[in-house]
């Protein structure tokens, strides 16, 4: 008993001393770096001052803070850990004839006075230089200030042309009612009315039979990283013949107009990307007809108009436990605010009623890893929605295909409630050459899963679908003008339209001119 009391007293004293030590330890650092610094300190509690300074600097350099300075000092019993990452200084832009100087700096995410991260700067520069009409040659000029911190000035020499970027893409992500193939032709135009705005125009069709599907789309993005806004509109027209069997001879035709607005407004106090409000609305005006027999007798004619406001929160965070990657999340809801017409809803489903709302959630983590000496990265994604009542088809969660569960048909299953998950490992990019084109190719391996279910008395007891798959593929970029993706998924669960182990290939290629 005496031994137990002594041990307890010792632990209590150690706890008090630990708390006292923490109270006399302070970190002086830009707010953006403090989460990263504290994560490191949590994982390295027993380092000496010299070891702490050296190890933390090496860690931050690996995180991209090339010019970081770390020092540990003690004054009057207080230990101060000071981190000076270096900051973005003066930027000089020259040579640009078409693109605005502020727009170029915004694309490079250059903001004077903010911490300088070389990895982020390199990625932003590479992303901008992928466009045919602009090339930015960067010359960094670090200088040391009176307090020892590095100020990174930069000269940007720009060669630009008229900022037009035509593109064409081919993919097999169409639904099974059509040929399954899609061709899209489009044009992206920068700085139409203001710096850093983009106008995108595109036309999509089924290349096997354009009469089965044609779609027009336009979007205009404007604003800055402090307040990004987008307006969009489109129209689609489709007609599918013999959708059930040639003997029944049932054709379905439909057309629809849609338009909307979306915006993202950062509200993070420390890092603007850490928290933001997203909001907007969509307007849908849909019409569909069903024809029967060789004479194409009209059997059904439906119209549906929906106005769908939405609001939510989204954010970004540094992965915990000393990991080097980032995490992303969003939480929001979509509703018709009781503006729908019950008569139109009842034609689609007698159980549908206006006033529905749909909560949605998404979560993703990206983390660089090294496996068996090979560098790569892991990406985990999860998104879903929930509803306790039946929803219009356009609001149901879909699974299957390249965007959710690979190995299955595109948008094979729908549900009022559903989720999809993806775990993907990507290897380091490798340089290669195909048909005389130089580029980079990256191998990927994945596991996908998804589940949807429907609500209401019209839904059967087993009106739910689950999917699982694994697979591999490659993604590549050639001459900064062509992107290619080739992925093969193997289903691990039977569905109504896809048997287990019946592998499916997902392909897409995009050319920019």
For every predicted segment, state its role.
Residues 49-53, 58, 64, 69, ...:
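Outer-membrane beta-barrel initiation region
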Residues 211-317:
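Transmembrane beta-barrel wall of Gram-negative outer-membrane proteins
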């Amino acid at each position: 008993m005496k031994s137990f009391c002594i041990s307890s007293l010792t632990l209590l004293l150690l706890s008090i001393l630990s708390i006292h030590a923490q109270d006399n330890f302070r970190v002086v650092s830009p707010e953006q770096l403090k989460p990263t610094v504290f994560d490191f300190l949590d994982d390295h509690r027993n380092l000496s001052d010299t070891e702490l300074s050296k190890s933390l600097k090496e860690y931050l350099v690996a995180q991209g803070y090339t010019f970081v300075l770390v020092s540990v000092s003690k004054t009057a019993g207080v230990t101060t850990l000071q981190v000076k990452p270096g900051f973005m200084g003066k930027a000089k832009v020259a040579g640009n004839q078409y693109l605005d100087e502020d727009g170029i700096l915004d694309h490079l995410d250059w903001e004077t006075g903010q911490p300088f991260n070389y990895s982020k700067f390199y990625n932003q520069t590479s992303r901008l230089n992928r466009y045919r009409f602009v090339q930015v040659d960067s010359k960094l000029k670090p200088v040391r200030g009176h307090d020892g911190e590095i100020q990174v000035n930069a000269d940007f020499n720009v060669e630009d042309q008229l900022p037009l970027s035509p593109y064409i893409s081919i993919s097999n992500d169409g639904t099974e009612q059509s040929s399954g193939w899609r061709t899209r032709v489009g044009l992206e135009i920068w700085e139409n009315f203001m710096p850093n705005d983009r106008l995108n125009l595109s036309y999509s069709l089924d290349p096997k039979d354009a009469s089965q599907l044609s779609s027009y789309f336009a979007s205009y993005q404007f604003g800055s990283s402090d307040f990004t806004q987008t307006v969009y509109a489109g129209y689609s027209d489709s007609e599918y013949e013999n959708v059930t069997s040639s003997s029944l001879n049932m054709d379905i035709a439909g057309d629809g107009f849609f338009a909307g607005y979306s915006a993202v407004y950062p509200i993070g106090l420390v890092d603007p990307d850490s928290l933001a409000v997203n909001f907007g609305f969509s307007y849908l005006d849909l019409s569909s007809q069903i024809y029967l027999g060789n004479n194409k007798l009209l059997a059904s004619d439906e119209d549906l108009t929906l106005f769908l406001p939405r609001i939510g929160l989204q954010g970004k965070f540094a992965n915990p436990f000393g990991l080097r990657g980032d995490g992303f999340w969003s939480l929001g809801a979509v509703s018709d605010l009781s503006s729908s017409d019950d008569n139109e809803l009842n034609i689609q489903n007698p159980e549908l009623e206006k006033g529905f709302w749909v909560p949605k959630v998404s979560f993703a983590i990206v983390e660089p890893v090294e496996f068996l000496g090979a560098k790569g990265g892991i990406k985990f994604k999860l998104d879903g929605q929930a509803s306790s009542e039946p929803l219009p088809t356009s609001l149901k969660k879909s699974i299957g295909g390249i965007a959710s569960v690979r190995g299955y048909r595109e948008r094979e299953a729908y549900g009022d409630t559903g989720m999809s998950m993806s775990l993907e490992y990507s290897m380091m990019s490798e340089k290669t050459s195909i048909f005389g084109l130089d580029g980079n190719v990256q191998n990927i391996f994945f596991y996908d899963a998804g589940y949807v279910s429907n609500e209401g008395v019209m839904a059967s007891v087993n009106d739910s679908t689950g999917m699982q798959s694994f697979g591999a593929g490659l993604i590549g970029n050639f001459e900064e003008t062509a992107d290619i993706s080739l992925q093969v998924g193997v289903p691990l669960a039977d569905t109504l339209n896809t048997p287990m182990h019946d592998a499916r290939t997902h392909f897409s290629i995009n050319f920019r001119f």
